[in-house]
Amino acid sequence: MEIVYEGTFTEASQTDFNNQLTAAQSAGADMIFLPIYYTPASVILTQANAMGYAPTFFGVDGMDGILTAENFDASLAEGVYLLTPFSADSEDEMTQNFVAEYQDRFGEIPNQFGADAYDAIYTLYQAIQAAGVTADMSNEEICDA
């Protein structure tokens, strides 16, 4: 694999990627790595499609949620590779319980961000349980536990 183009953008310029896409296409890039969040990624996929440019897109966990991005045609994400630490399809019992409870409460399948928040709170819960923290303890007692 050879890197043929490297491009960047700023927060202020994340609504128009035509220059970067044109440069990547002109350089012959047949794969584009997107280590970004899903909102700018949805714009990139939309603009690439509009210009007829169809490289393979490879993203990371920040792109989890792209299918629910506002005003995004989710069909454009078909074939995008995504590396993420969470899969709602996991057969793990704890994951399936989380997915079911999340879906009941919010009416949608959770993405990696919801799973990360759950993991953070569950880790705190486990630490509190292991330390024997109770509601009547002072801040100092909790810290010492």
Residue ranges and their predicted role:
Residues 1-145:
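Extracytosolic ligand-binding ectodomains
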